Amino acid sequence: MATVVFTVQSGRDPARVSSPVTGTVKDLSALGMSVVTPKIAPDGIHVMYDTLMTTRNRVDATVFVEGDPPVRVSGKVVWFRGADDPKGTYIFGMQFDQPTEEFEDGLDLK
């Protein structure tokens, strides 16, 4: 199991950054991850787009994999939807800016 703490940075106003949100990593590879989260728009900043859906927002995250040191990643969200479980949560897919060596072999997070 892996936990992630992430913030969302506005693409329109980069000085505007959300408060940290804790989520659960569902899938993880060197190129990206999917995250289950209770909030899709922390502090009113949507994980994917600004309010007009014209400018991409950015996500900065720290991934905590049990037994390993924390790993910082940055990137953009490429998809999102409501999650099936737990009820009332969301899931999003994040593409990293740079491949992450620590996750090169992927991880079994089940």
What are these regions (language model features)?
Residues 1-110:
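Structured alpha-helical
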